[in-house]
Amino acid sequence: MPDYDLYYWQLPFRGQFIRALLAFAGKRWNEYADADIAKVMSADVADQAVPFMGPPMLVDRRSGAAIAEMPAIAMYLGETLRLLPASALDRALTLKVVADANDVIDELTRDGGRDMWTPARWHEFKPRLGRWMRIFEETGRRHGLTPDAGFLLGGRRAGVADIVAATLWHTAADRFPVIGELLAQNASACAGLARRLYAQPSLANLAAVTRQQFGDGYCGGEIEASMRRVIK
């Protein structure tokens, strides 16, 4: 029996972070057709499992708890699946990493398609994307991360910060190889972390299933079309 119900569009993008955390922890979950998600999303807030504007939304089938907003879901899963570090500082840094990842994908999609990518906009954005990569890289290096070993916030095993960071860069680089090239130039340790985690059976299987289900899809819509015209 599935452990969770995940409401997210049939694309990787923001939902992929939640899928990765569940897969890494060996959990099973249901997903739903886009029409079903739209129905849940548009319901009166008094009738929603948790009042929310848009997906992802997760329901823990064991407890009935419902959570929306990607960072909140990630931290809930980290807490309940024992994927968070012990110290208050490292938990706060975990949340920072998750929030940073959320910011990066928003910027990659021009804040959800506020406007479309053009060659000039991409040229202007590339240094900023490189800086984002170096922010993740410096975070890891301050905690002993190298291209071949270690974790983003130190410790002996991967946690929410590692899984989210690896998923951010692995998914973007897989869909847009030029992003992978930029990552190798700016954040070799993070690139190594993503390779190592996505070589593990749980995440390797997730990547394969994602490819089978969604093909080359990343975020969908006109914004993805503009990304594919320009980010190459």
Predicted regions and their residues:
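Long, amphipathic alpha-helical surface segments
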Residues: 201-203, 217
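Exported/periplasmic ABC-transporter solute-binding proteins
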Residues: 203, 209-210
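Acidic/histidine-enriched, glycine/proline-rich intrinsically disordered or flexible terminal extensions
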Residues: 210-232
